[in-house]
């Protein structure tokens, strides 16, 4: 039991609003794919009524939840089902000392391992791609050997920004960029595309003086106390940025922005009220700028793309901003997929006990993409990108990178 987290965890009493319609269970991707999962109604409001009486009613079946929040999206009564489950796992979930604890630590502490791996990225990437290493990780710590581990960049985005973006403060308008772990350690090109798009709109980019992982992989793997420390750190630096520069804070990760806005107060008990209204997912900001007349010059992009909606973007209500933004790219043929969860759910699908369920959840999406005859898949979430590329075998790009592809002007950053 996590006694430190219990002291700060928020108390969720929205279970009283549950009308027992079970629409959450119908909408849950795990309940459809795994008969061992009781479903969000039983794990959430039904279970919470018992857990507030005694911790002995905690059930390890809660670990089967992906934290996709689709149950909350579906709930007609506004019950915070996913939050209940996440908080319960943080409060009562046991973490016995065994090899899977090592796996969960490695998968969730992205800053620690990213900072170690990026200087040696070619070696690390080569090693983790070896079948022998994959088999060893499967047998020892339980990372499924059929999964392709994310590749690290040889050098971080923050390092590139420091070396190449000294002119950013010269722009009259400024935005702050919460780049997250994925851009910093795995795919700096997305951050570079973000800077290029902003500069094409005559907007400069600033980074926080310091940022840590948003905390979502820590929450998912039961390290709630560490996630809360990260949240307090980030809120401190977000507040300083907003107060000093009056700049909106943008994220290119649908999960990072959702976590900064929603998970901090509702799951971790961290007050973000001073900055939450200034935090935006990037496509929301971009569409507003485009519609107000501040759109960059773009050339036609004669490509067919299929768009997959990430679960956290749907939960945050920002889906239409991305779709409408993509429609503004000239020449682009856009197909919006009728897809649900991709199944990876951050670190969930990397675990050997979840691998088959993860693939089953995403099978409809993979089939739709493979039969689409598209040039690219587009999604706002990095882990959706990994899952699609691995299982549907189609290059998957971010909406911001697609915009950068359409820009006429050369990058100025």
Label the predicted regions.
Residues 6-7, 81-413:
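Iron-sulfur cluster-binding electron-transfer modules in prokaryotic oxidoreductases
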Residues 23-48, 64-92, 259, 381-383, ...:
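Iron-sulfur cluster-binding cysteine motifs and their immediate structural context
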Residues 2-15, 51-62, 199-201, 328-331:
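Short, intrinsically disordered, charge-biased short linear motifs at domain edges
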Residues 52-56, 70, 105-109:
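A ubiquitous short alpha-helical element
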Residues 1-9, 36-56, 317-325:
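Short, charged low-complexity linear segments at domain edges
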Residues 12-31, 57-79, 114, 185, ...:
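Cysteine-centered iron-sulfur cluster-binding motifs in ferredoxin-type domains/subunits
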């Amino acid at each position: 039991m996590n006694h430190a987290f219990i002291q700060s965890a928020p108390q969720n009493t929205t279970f009283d609003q549950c009308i027992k319609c079970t629409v959450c269970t119908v909408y849950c991707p795990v309940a459809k794919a795994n008969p061992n999962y009781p479903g969000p109604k039983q794990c959430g409001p039904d279970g919470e009524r018992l857990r507030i009486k005694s911790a002995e009613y905690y059930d390890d079946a809660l670990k089967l939840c992906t934290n996709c929040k689709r149950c909350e999206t579906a709930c007609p009564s506004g019950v915070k089902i996913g939050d209940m489950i996440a908080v319960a796992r943080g409060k009562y979930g046991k973490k016995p000392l065994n090899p899977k604890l090592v796996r969960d630590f490695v998968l969730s502490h992205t800053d620690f391992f990213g900072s170690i791996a990026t200087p040696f990225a070619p070696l690390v990437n080569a090693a983790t791609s070896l079948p022998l290493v994959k088999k060893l990780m499967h047998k020892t710590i339980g990372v499924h050997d059929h999964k392709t581990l994310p590749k690290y960049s040889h050098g971080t985005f923050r390092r590139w920004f420091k070396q190449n973006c000294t002119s950013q403060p010269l722009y009259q308008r400024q935005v702050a960029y919460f780049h997250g772990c994925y851009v910093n350690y795995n795919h700096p090109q997305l951050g570079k595309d973000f800077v290029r798009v902003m500069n094409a709109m005559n907007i400069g980019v600033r980074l926080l003086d310091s940022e840590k992982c948003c905390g979502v992989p820590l929450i998912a793997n039961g390290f709630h106390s560490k996630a809360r420390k990260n949240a307090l750190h980030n809120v401190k630096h977000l507040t300083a940025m907003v107060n000093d520069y009056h700049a909106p804070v943008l994220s290119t990760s649908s999960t990072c922005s959702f976590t900064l806005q929603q998970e901090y107060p509702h799951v971790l008990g961290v007050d973000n009220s001073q900055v939450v209204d200034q935090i935006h997912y990037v496509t929301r900001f971009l569409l507003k700028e485009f519609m107000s007349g501040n759109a960059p010059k773009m050339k036609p992009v004669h490509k067919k793309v299929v768009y997959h909606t990430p679960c956290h973007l749907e939960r945050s209500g920002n889906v239409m901003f991305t779709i409408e933004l993509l429609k503004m790219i000239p020449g682009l043929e856009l197909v919006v997929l009728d897809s649900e969860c991709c199944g990876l759910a951050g670190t969930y699908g990397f675990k050997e006990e979840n691998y088959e369920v993860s693939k089953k959840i995403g099978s409809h999406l993979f089939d739709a993409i493979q039969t689409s005859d598209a040039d690219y898949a587009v999604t706002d979430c990095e882990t959706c990108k990994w899952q699609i590329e691995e299982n549907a075998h189609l290059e998957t790009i971010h909406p911001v990178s697609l915009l950068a592809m359409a820009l006429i002007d050369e990058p100025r950053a």
